């Protein structure tokens, strides 16, 4: 009990300051709790599961007997234990206050347990294997596309079933209908309506006042122009 009293007194001085209870008051409280059957041993005081039953029992005793000395001492001790627990003090003495047992370090969680060297090597090998597999997956060529077919035949080889073509060319584009381009079929007919004039020959000009044909643009007679230029001679330049 003396060791427990010393630890609790140190905790109260740290977190309670001048209002810290004395070692005598702490010892009297522990003796009462053991007498009432609330503690099997003084070290049970470090367990948070025993705090609420102790608080309830001392509160009832204070109301019945009018003695609140032990309840006041317990309130200070409880405040110190909770403060140490909330702040998660890492010293060995603080761990003893928190009910982690005799100054021993609490067993770490599964994520904090250091694995043996053999397991670490195995885990490292698995990580390396996963990394290699991911790299190979990125470098591997894409899966060959299934040949495209129309109905049951392949575009490339025309096989109905069991096509072995790795890839097949896309189907040819549909034939562009005649509606997208102007038709030239009527051009020859229009040229031949005036008679048997061959294609490319000069069309007869419409006579003025002719009722049957619409007037068209006059064609330049380059042969006549050349004859006139030859007969007139070169122009005389005035000095």
Swiss-Prot record:
The gene is ev-1. GO terms for cellular component: virion component. The lineage of its organism: Viruses, Riboviria, Pararnavirae, Artverviricota, Revtraviricetes. One of its GO terms (biological process) is viral budding via host ESCRT complex. Residues 124-144, 184-214 are annotated as: Disordered. A motif (PPXY motif) lies at residues 172-175. It comes from Avian endogenous virus EV-1. It comes from the Viruses. GO terms for molecular function: structural constituent of virion. Keywords: Host-virus interaction, Viral budding, Viral budding via the host ESCRT complexes, Viral matrix protein, Viral release from host cell, Virion. Late-budding domains (L domains) are short sequence motifs essential for viral particle budding. They recruit proteins of the host ESCRT machinery (Endosomal Sorting Complex Required for Transport) or ESCRT-associated proteins. Gag contains one L domain: a PPXY motif which potentially interacts with the WW domain 3 of NEDD4 E3 ubiquitin ligase (Potential). The keyword Endoplasmic reticulum does not apply. Residues 124-141 have a biased composition (Basic and acidic residues). Pfam families: Retro_M (PF02813). This is Gag polyprotein.
